[in-house]
Amino acid sequence: MPMIPYSGGSSLEANFAAPYGGMSIDFAYMDQIVALHEDDMDVVVQPSLQWMHLNDKIKETGLFFPVDPGPSAKIGGMVGTSCSGTNAVRYGTMKEWVVNLTVVLADGTVIKTKKIPRKSSAGYNLTGLFVGSEGTLGIVTEITLKLAVIPQETTVAVVTFPTIRDAASAAAQIMRIGVPVGAMEIMDEVQMNVVNRAGTTGKTWKEMPTMFFKFSGTKAGVQDNISVVRSITKAHCGGDFDFAKDAREAKVLWSARKEALWSMLSLKEEGQEVWSTDVAVPLSRLPDIIEISKKEMDDLGLFASILGHVGDGNFHESVLYDNTNPKERAAVEKCLHDMVDRALEMDGTCTVRSRASPTHKLQANRYRENTGLGWARRSPF
């Protein structure tokens, strides 16, 4: 009988679904910090601890956990899906921040995947094997995470562009030059309209393709990075930078990005659904795929938007459609599947942040043909 570990159920791609039935193992009450080692810059936690709660509890130490998916995500699910968030362009994804796991195997054996030291060449990389395995190899009951130092200076800036291609091209050049931005996000004019209609940010936004930047580090370093990014965005037809003057303004400016999905969901009417999925491509192909996908989405004649973590070539499409209308649903499905096929043709991947969902099955099979996923299915692990 399949045993499905469940920590928060916040996945947007239904990763906790049980298509073949089974038993749910609920970790709801395992939500504590087991041990905090400030000098070692690591923390031991249970799987149902929310990452934002973790950061609230340790902020007085000057440390934080930098992986930032949706606010409701919990550490167990983050490990299972090898998730990421807006900070990935600087800090990487979940797999870079997991030191050790306590895992219960199918036969009841309890193992630890690694000792605490950050570097080790002894044996297989078992931690890396379990991160992203979605509970298929064992049930994770305890996690040791690396922590980072809270940057001395953090600020946020927002800049608009006339087209989504201009914004994507600017993002690709910023990464190619090597500017260490803290985060770099993109939202199209439809998504900016959604945020305005939801009215949850306390600000009225220009309804144009928009990029959101975080800059963090030393004061001098932040100013240098801002100067370089400003010149690049200007060269790609970017408008004026809207800078945060203080922490309150930074929170307001960044809120549009964090509220993006929930703003779209708030527009749902009876019978409507939001279909959202993501892809990633090499940075050099990002402007092409975003431009083509945007046109095809607009041709649907539905409420459809693009947002994404363009610093690592990753973006999402979200479409609001009538689920009771078979023709409308079929058109949306074709549009999103075409986007995924296009990404695969560009040497990209069919899913990035949330692992492969039921909607990715056909594309995942294509992806498997040319990667090690086929071997993974046949492997003894």
State the predicted function of each range:
Residues 109, 356-381:
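Activity-critical C-terminal alpha-helical subdomain
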Residues 149, 158-160, 168-338, 342, ...:
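C-terminal substrate-recognition/cap domain of FAD-linked oxidoreductases
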